[in-house]
From Swiss-Prot:
GO terms for cellular component: cytoplasm; excinuclease repair complex. The lineage of its organism: Bacteria, Bacillati, Actinomycetota, Actinomycetes, Micrococcales. Residues 31-188 form the Helicase ATP-binding domain. Belongs to the UvrB family. It is found in: Cytoplasm. One of its GO terms (molecular function) is excinuclease ABC activity. Residues 607-632 are annotated as: Disordered. A motif (Beta-hairpin) lies at residues 97-120. This is UvrABC system protein B. One of its GO terms (biological process) is SOS response. Keywords: ATP-binding, Cytoplasm, DNA damage, DNA excision, DNA repair, Excision nuclease, Helicase, Hydrolase, Nucleotide-binding, SOS response. Its main location: cytoplasm. The beta-hairpin motif is involved in DNA binding. Gene3D superfamilies: P-loop containing nucleotide triphosphate hydrolases, UVR domain.
């Protein structure tokens, strides 16, 4: 079955229009993409609005787009930006749904087998299903993803074939529909009505699809669908009545009965062949282990159509040849999609490195009888397989790597900032007396209420420097990999808010740090060639001072290395162009003042508000959440809502403590809605 995608135009909704270098960059990028160029490079200086440029590019070319980021945090930031810029289009977030993941592994030296252990984030899993649902049902889709998009995923054709399309007036037997939902990996549960489950009450079936927050109610009269509703799963309130709805499977690895029967046959055949090899080599223990594990999985697949670790048999389910690339998220896109790789100097090498790390672990499992050789084909794409599947790519970076620069026919530059801000001036100073000089520079800027970043080469030096500055009366903190993520967010917010003035770090002051209050970046030991002092790293670090009108960078070095020369020459080139543009157009650089948003503060405020509200009603935590289902129209009373609010508040704070920020933010939003509902009920006098 070929997907039928609804067509709606991509549209950017913004109070701002393209400015600075953006109009030229957008026009040139769109021209090259429309001309069919396979690779285009955007060299965009820090703070020039590359994300907005990408959004306007998508609006120009009208293509479904995959945006790749090199970590979950940046992906979440990008997804938020694109949702604000394109509110009428489907902006999806596709990352690994594991909060914790320990893959199965075997250590031959100690004869230790490590079972697969993982903790799945249900909200991120919903967003993954929402992504594939959107890709197969509409064209106006922007997916923000990490390298998770190149890992194996179920075959889109089988996913589509398993989908059930329901329509009012449609003839279908109730039991047939129930069996269909079970085959789609949904579970019947008449008590716990949650995502991935369905429940049956007489001729009414209710299901919460894996990709939805709202439930679907199917009311039947005999073998005919009489009505379809979308409803709130908690309160049972009907959101809207529908004429038709499509329900997609509850797993990306779903397969039809005939496909599964064929797959089991080829798995058994491979098992016999592999057992023969192992026994011939005298590996009797490995042969027995493989026989037991595989036969158990086969029995599970025969009984329920699924087993733990079914992805290791994906080659058989898909009917692929040995060594053939797996299906992944890229296969769910239409043929004419566009890929935008953000911070390409980091993301491109990351994509290329995924395959080897995965295969080395699995080879050990295969050799020792824990998995069949076909498990090796459940893997991420190799770099050449990735490029074969991508029709056109736009690489975005302030410092494009050699690979990107060698691919495109010249780069598209975006150097001029909409704010008129110019790249910081660079001053090279000798290392002798560098600490005293830096201390003097810090005091000058503290008097102006400006902030300072100091980057060192080692953790020890960062700590010692922090202690020295603190003894000298400077308000200072340090930041390195041992500082946990939540504390890192707090430190950056405190720096911007003026709780302290100087932040000392190592390699954490590069991509993705947006600190407009910083006017000085000090780079100690700038002449020590290496990863932390390469031209790319230096340019990225210099960019941290590019969001302030009086931004400066002080490099402490006794020798001018090649990396320093390249970084200084590139920065001077950009400054010259920016100053000339500002002079020609009469632009005065405008200070960039961004609102300081700290998720920890927002969540703490929400939690305090909830506590006061419940105490005000004499509540607090009550008995376990009662069963909210009602015959007819379900509704939650005030007391029940209090309990739910209390539970949700605990879940929100727990999610924040476990660094599940996306989940915490969503719980915060849901909490706000429920509290508004409770206040309205109190105002109206509807108390239970």
């Amino acid at each position: 079955m070929q997907p039928t995608r609804s067509v709606r135009p991509f549209k950017v909704v913004s109070d701002y229009s393209p400015s600075g270098d953006q109009p030229t960059a957008i026009a040139e990028l769109a021209g090259r993409v429309n001309a069919g160029e396979p690779d285009v490079v955007l060299l965009g200086a820090t703070g020039t609005g590359k994300s907005a440029t990408a959004a306007w590019l998508i609006e120009k070319v009208q293509r479904p787009t995959l945006i790749l980021a090199h970590n979950k945090t940046l992906a979440a930031q990008l997804a938020t930006e694109f949702r604000e810029l394109m509110p009428d289009n489907a902006v999806e977030y596709f990352v690994s749904y594991y909060d914790y993941y320990q893959p199965e592994a075997y250590v031959p030296q100690t004869d230790t087998f490590i079972e697969k252990d993982s903790s799945v984030n249900a909200e991120v899993e919903r967003l993954r299903h929402s992504t594939t649902n959107s890709l197969l049902s509409r064209r106006d889709v922007v997916v923000v993803s990490t390298v998770s998009c190149i890992y194996g995923l179920g075959q889109p054709e089988q996913y589509m074939n398993a989908m059930v399309a329901l329509q009012v007036g449609m003839q279908i037997d109730r039991d047939t529909l129930i069996r269909k939902f079970v085959s789609m990996q949904y579970q019947r549960n008449d008590v716990d009505f949650s995502r991935g489950n369905f429940r049956v009450r007489g001729d009414t079936i209710e299901i919460i699809p894996m990709y939805e927050e709202l439930a679907i109610r199917i009311e039947m009269f005999g073998d005919e669908i009489e009505a379809l509703y979308q409803l709130h799963p908690l309160t049972g309130d009907v959101v809207r009545k529908m004429d038709s709805v499509s329900v997609f499977p509850g797993s990306h690895y779903v397969a039809e009965t005939e496909v599964m029967r064929r797959a089991i046959g080829t798995i058994q055949q491979e098992l016999e062949e592999r057992l023969t090899v192992l026994e011939r080599e005298g590996k009797l223990l490995e042969a027995q282990r493989l026989r037991m594990r595989t036969n158990f999985d086969i029995e599970m697949m025969q009984q329920i159509g699924f087993c733990s670790g079914i992805e290791n048999y994906s080659r058989h389910i898909d009917g692929r040849d040995a060594g053939e690339a797996p299906h992944c998220l890229l296969d769910y896109f239409p043929d004419d999609f566009l890929v935008v790789i953000d911070e390409s100097h980091v993301t491109v090498p990351q994509i290329g490195a995924m395959f080897e790390g995965d295969s080395s672990r699995k080879r050990t499992l295969v050799e020792h009888g824990f998995r069949l050789p076909s498990a090796l084909d459940n893997r991420p794409l190799k770099w050449n397989e990735f490029t074969e599947r991508v029709p056109q790519t736009v690489y975005m970076s302030a410092t494009p790597g050699k690979y990107e620069l060698g691919m495109g026919d010249g780069v598209v530059e975006q150097i001029i900032r909409p704010t008129g801000l110019i790249d910081p001036a660079i001053v090279v100073k000798p290392t002798k007396g560098q600490i005293d000089d830096l201390l003097e520079q810090i005091r000058i800027r503290v008097e102006k209420d400006e902030r300072i970043l100091v980057t060192t080469l080692t953790k020890k030096m960062a700590e010692e420097l922090t202690d020295y500055f603190a003894e000298a009366g400077v308000r200072v903190r340090y930041l390195h990999s041992d500082v946990d993520t939540l504390r890192r967010v707090e430190l950056l917010s405190e720096l911007r808010a003026g709780v302290y003035d100087v932040l000392v770090g190592i390699n954490l002051l590069r991509e993705g740090l947006d600190l407009p209050e910083v006017s000085l970046v000090a780079i100690l030991d700038a002449d020590k060639e290496g990863f932390l002092r390469s031209s790319t790293s230096l340019i990225q670090t210099i960019g941290r001072a590019a969001r302030n009108v009086s931004g400066e960078v002080h490099m402490y070095a006794d020798v001018l290395t090649d990396s320093m020369k390249r970084a200084i020459e590139e920065t001077d080139r950009r400054r010259e162009k920016q100053v000339a543009y500002n002079t020609e157009h009469g632009i005065d650089p405008t200070p960039l003042r961004k609102r300081i948003a700290d998720i920890t503060e927002i969540l703490a405020r929400e939690g305090e508000d909830t506590k006061k509200m419940l105490e005000g009603r004499g509540g607090g935590k009550r008995s376990p959440t009662p069963n909210l289902r009602r015959e007819g129209k379900a509704a939650a009373g005030a007391n029940e809502l209090e309990t739910i609010i209390s539970d949700l508040n605990d879940q929100m704070l727990q999610a924040a403590g476990e660094l599940k920020f996306e989940l915490a933010a969503r719980l915060r939003d849901e909490l706000g809605d429920l509290k508004r509902e409770l206040r309205q009920m109190e105002k109206a006098g509807h108390l239970s």
